[in-house]
Amino acid sequence: MPTRPRSVLLLCAVALVGARPLERQSAPPLEITYLANMGVLLEVGNRRVVIDGLHRAELDGTPPVPPDLLGPLETATGRMRGVEAILTTHRHLDHFASRSVRARLASDPIVHYLAPSEVVDTLRAHGPVSFPNRIHGLTPRPGGRLDVDVAGIRITALDLPHNPTRTPRAQNVGYLIRLNGVTILHVGDADPTAERYAPHNLPAEHIDVAIVPTWYITESSALVRQHIAPRKVIASHVWLDATEKLRRDVDREWPGAVVLMRPGERLRIDREP
């Protein structure tokens, strides 16, 4: 494979040791705001996407989105105004709250909502929803993908079944998001096995940032290197009692990986002038 040119990045707020840079010279900075558990707000230039950020429950020791973030998320106010797409990976309560999604759709006439079909079915089972034409149920075929364009944002839904060892069955979808030249992968709670990842050939996607559960790094880092091959790793899905030991454990397996632990913390990835 030919070698592409590389640039040098600075990560403000968190130092990344040994991280590989984003390589698309035209891409503006990527900003990530941690919402809770696997929830993030992604911003690249004027494009904004939220993934797994609308949930209210503390489930199995995972933190809910705090009120100072959840309120603006539900009402499309403050920094949460102007989000063009909200994505949910699966229906578990530490990733999805029907009440919160319905509130956002009712208060925001622009946003599109993308989720596995069983999540959309749950949403609609609770009664009529605002702007149903902006709700997209996604069911990729086994090992397959579905491509969606939302206001010029290219989103690919990947069939990545839920990790069967951690919580009850759920239809889990991973997402590839292309924001102004930056490619981001969010896997939800996908099963970290080669069987699930190999069909997608993700190294060919040249992923700039992969957002994965912490156990992907502490228990399955070889899979991430071989079947995702991201330039930068962001680890989340932490428990309320997580300590700095978790950061050390992640750093030992993947030097330079960032662990998101405090809701509201923000990362900004800049290029040197």
Where are these regions (language model features)?
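Active-site-proximal loop/helix segments of hydrolase catalytic cores
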Residues: 160-227
